[in-house]
Regions:
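Exposed beta-strand-loop-beta-strand "reactive/processing" segments of non-cytosolic proteins
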Residues: 46-83, 173-201
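Polybasic, proline/glycine-rich intrinsically disordered low-complexity segments
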Residues: 14-47, 57, 81-178, 200-292
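Bacterial N-terminal signal peptides
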Residues: 1-9
């Protein structure tokens, strides 16, 4: 029985790996449809990091599978995209979904020659961590500090039925900033995952900022789920995302976060249908089949 169970686990892992390899080229093409700049430098395109920083599965939500990409600005994460998919219930393919979040302190300018659009209205604000131990001088020691600081953050999500899911820290950062001598001299992008799967539900930036020769900690949290979210640090709530008229399924009030269904494709990448979201408060849209030529 133990051997049989192990074989089932290995078979499932192999199937997940095959799915990931088939979907990755499709996901890369999707993320390449975006062109990002910051408002102060509209002619300097942000660097798209085409190598995924994370891949995930969520068996509890219709066998979803996805990959996370970053756009960088001088080596710092400026925006994040998760392209993920799930089986379509009517067509022999998978729904392709786009989930995005602005990370730069400046407002992003996003250009995309497609039906679905993302228009952030501000940058992602940072908050001070004045009660934390001052950043160490050595880069290696600061990474250890960041890991310990990140462990102070936790929380929970509530699905549409009111079921509570615990949020836990992904121990390895999604991305570590390269060294710098001024401004943001160090930092890392972390994520909190739900117990429902391995997909990030909350983004957590921890940064070291140099001001007048002194190093200080700052942080930012970002919604990365359509569920209700609550994040605490040392038993005090520091971030929440509660569904409302201005904070619906598809975006947050400032459109830093954006989520939509884009299309239906086969595992070979053939387009079967386009999806046209009509209501930002619901997770589905109009499916427009593509006629074979």
């Amino acid at each position: 029985m133990v051997l049989f169970s192990l074989l089932l686990v290995l078979a499932a892992a192999d199937a997940d790996d095959r799915l990931s390899k088939k979907m990755l080229p499709i996901y890369v093409k999707e993320v390449e449809t975006y062109s990002l700049t910051v408002k102060s430098a509209p002619k300097q395109a942000l660097e798209l990091k085409k190598e995924p920083v994370f891949e995930w599965l969520n068996p509890a939500r219709n066998a979803q599978q996805g990959t996370i990409f970053l756009w960088l600005r001088n080596g710092r994460p400026a925006a994040l995209a998760c392209i993920f998919s799930a089986p379509n219930r009517r067509l022999p393919g998978r729904n392709i979904n786009h989930e995005l979040h602005a990370l730069d302190v400046e407002k992003l300018v996003v250009k995309r020659d497609q039906y679905n659009q993302w228009k952030p209205q501000a940058g992602l604000a940072r908050k001070q961590l004045s009660d934390a131990t001052p950043p160490a001088a050595a880069r290696g020691a600061r990474l250890l500090q960041m890991r310990r600081l990140a462990q102070e953050f936790g929380g929970h999500s509530l699905d549409r039925d009111g079921k509570r899911w615990q949020l836990r820290l992904l121990p390895t950062p999604l991305y570590r900033y390269p060294a710098a001598k001024s401004g943001i001299v160090d930092g890392a992008l972390f994520a909190l995952m739900s117990s429902a799967g391995t997909d990030p539900e909350v983004l957590l930036l921890l940064e070291v900022k140099k001001v007048d020769g002194n190093l200080h900690w700052q942080y930012a949290c970002g919604r990365f789920s359509d569920w209700e979210l609550h994040v605490q640090r040392k038993d005090k709530e520091v971030f929440a995302s509660i569904p409302s008229e201005s904070n619906p399924f598809a975006h947050d009030p400032l459109h830093l976060y954006r989520l939509y269904q884009e299309k239906v494709v086969t595992l070979e990448g053939k387009l079967l249908a386009r999806i046209r979201p009509k209501n930002p408060h619901v997770p589905w849209g109009e499916i427009v089949p593509v006629k074979d030529k």
